[in-house]
Amino acid sequence: MSNVSGLFKDLTTVKKARNGRLASWDQRGKNQDYWEIPAGETISLGEVEGPGCITHIWMTSSCRKVVAPSILDPVLNASAAPVMEIHPALGVIWDDYDPFYYRKVLIKITWDDQDTPSVLAPLGDFFCIGNSYPGNFSSLPFNVSLKPEEAGRYGAPCSVSCYFPMPFNKKAKIE
């Protein structure tokens, strides 16, 4: 039981520190708080000056492949969020999830201006989504959550969390 009580020991300790949060929220007031990342491109999910400690990473993730004409073309309709849910009518599916998505996308974490990242892994492997097949689970360091109707689908959209404390001295960068 001493290990469990150790988890909560610091809750009542006053610390001389500051808290912060990075988010992708849409400042225009719309619900387009997402990033589209073209193949071969890299975006920065966050860059923080230190010293500090990343204590939680949370994100949702989805990758749709358009398999027929679609209203979700961001070139033709910039106001249509590609994360909208459009359920198939009469069994016709206009787009589908990329079954290999969680293996194709890499997460890269670099500390203190290192030349090589300390973390470089497929997104699914980092968040415990083996073989691009997400399933609901919760553990102390990781959590994956998906809607019941998405269960059993390779590349299905889900939300993921990581609670590993990741301390750094000068800077942390997540791509």
Spans of features found by a protein language model:
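Beta-strand-centric surfaces of beta-sandwich/beta-rich domains
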Residues: 1-175
